[in-house]
A protein has these predicted regions:
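Short beta-strand-centered segment that lines the nucleotide-binding/catalytic pocket of NTP-utilizing
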Residues: 61-72
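Glycine-rich phosphate-binding P-loop
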Residues: 39-52
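RNA pseudouridine synthases
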Residues: 127, 140-146, 165
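Short, Lys/Arg-enriched N-terminal segments with co-localized hydrophobic residues
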Residues: 3-32
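Small-molecule kinase domains that catalyze NTP-dependent phosphoryl transfer to phosphate-bearing small molecules
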Residues: 92-98, 173-218
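Conserved phosphate-donor/acceptor-positioning beta-strand/loop module used by diverse small-molecule
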Residues: 146-169, 174-184
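ATP-dependent small-molecule kinase phosphotransfer cores
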Residues: 72-132
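Extreme N-terminal starter segment of soluble prokaryotic enzymes
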Residues: 34-36
Length: 229
């Protein structure tokens, strides 16, 4: 059995220096340091920025766009296709995507979505084998669930903060960001459920869940760093 640490944090935790010390997993007398960090996140929560900061501060490799490029090389899929389908259900109809792909294992030929998922999974496992790294999204928390040297993080935020972030980052108009956020969340939920059987964003699936809207991106990054330093 692997012991997990669940932490609920509020804004009052900011500025406390070495808040957590080092995080280890102990099993049968063995001590394992958290060398691999997976960052799952709500769209617009700043998860990528947090992951990048963590990697820079710890000196870990960082895989986000880099993972997309590697999958493109090996699979032959265009990077744009991977960005759209590498962690999102089909844009046309999420429910139909789920129902259609639920029977994929009854067919000899894998769908393009399945081929992409399998390729991504293999690359994520290979990257983890290389050593200390931060991996953003793409079901990495599930793919690496049996590794005891992993810290699985979920980043969430309130709708207003997320809406402001995507307006600033992507130039989204003020009228539509909430709708875009809801659509992105739904597609991620369906994709994650389809390939993992788990509920995306459910606290029990992660070691720590942080609210970047309440804590701030920098504080979230610092907390994760303290857990692994």
């Amino acid at each position: 059995m692997c012991y997990t640490i669940s932490i609920r944090l509020s804004k009052t935790c900011q500025g406390r220096g070495n808040l957590f010390g080092r995080l280890y997993v102990k099993e049968r007398g063995e001590t394992v340091m958290k060398n691999i960090i997976t960052i799952s996140r709500e769209f617009g929560s700043g998860g990528r920025s947090i992951g990048k900061q963590v990697a820079e501060k710890l000196g870990y490799a960082f895989y986000d766009r880099e993972l997309v490029d590697e999958v493109a090389k090996r699979s032959g899929f265009a990077p744009e296709y991977i960005e759209e389908h590498g962690e999102y259900a089909n844009a046309r109809n999420s429910l139909l995507f789920y129902l259609a792909t639920a029977e994929r294992y009854s067919h000899d030929n894998l769908s393009m979505h399945d081929q992409l998922y399998i390729t991504q999974s293999k690359i994520i496992e290979e990257l983890a084998e290389k050593g200390k790294c931060v991996i953003v999204g793409r079901c990495a928390d599930y793919i690496l669930r049996d590794r005891k040297d992993c810290l699985h993080v979920f980043i969430c935020s309130d709708m207003a903060s997320r809406a402001r972030r995507i307006v600033e980052r992507y130039g989204q108009t003020q009228k539509a960001p909430e709708k875009r956020l809801a659509e992105k969340d739904q597609k991620r939920k369906v994709y994650y459920k389809n390939y993992t059987g788990r509920v995306w964003g459910q606290a029990q699936n992660y070691d720590i869940c942080l609210n970047s809207g309440a804590l701030g991106v920098d504080t979230c990054a610092d907390m994760i760093v303290q857990l692994c330093k």
